[in-house]
């Protein structure tokens, strides 16, 4: 209780002792709160990462930009306006007519029918009688 009251001017409970952030490998750091290393060598070289050569290409592609003095801008030339005929780039799709096969009618000879209603067609193996459509 004595430590809490003396260390906190606002008399608030402090659960962790407030310490400043100090590097561990600082040679001037007091070893009060840390375990003292077994062998203290003050002039030991701290291993560092080696600077490797840049052998890998960068992922960003850099495009060179020429100086404006090297950019050639052609002068504006007055040209006669040529009439360009408009070409319809959207071709109209015309449906291709598909020939529908007409059924060939081969009537059998009916003895009661007259000869003007019999249609003789190319010889086929099947015969189809013609019936009048009923309306």
UniProtKB/Swiss-Prot annotation:
Transmembrane feature ranges: none
Subcellular location: Secreted
Tissue: Mammary gland specific. Secreted in milk.
GO CC annotation terms, alphabetical: extracellular space
Keywords, sorted A to Z: Glycoprotein, Milk protein, Phosphoprotein, Secreted
BP-aspect Gene Ontology terms: lactation; protein stabilization
InterPro entries named in the record: Casein_kappa (IPR000117)
Function of the protein: Kappa-casein stabilizes micelle formation, preventing casein precipitation in milk.
Protein name: Kappa-casein
Organism field: Equus grevyi (Grevy's zebra)
Gene coding for it: CSN3
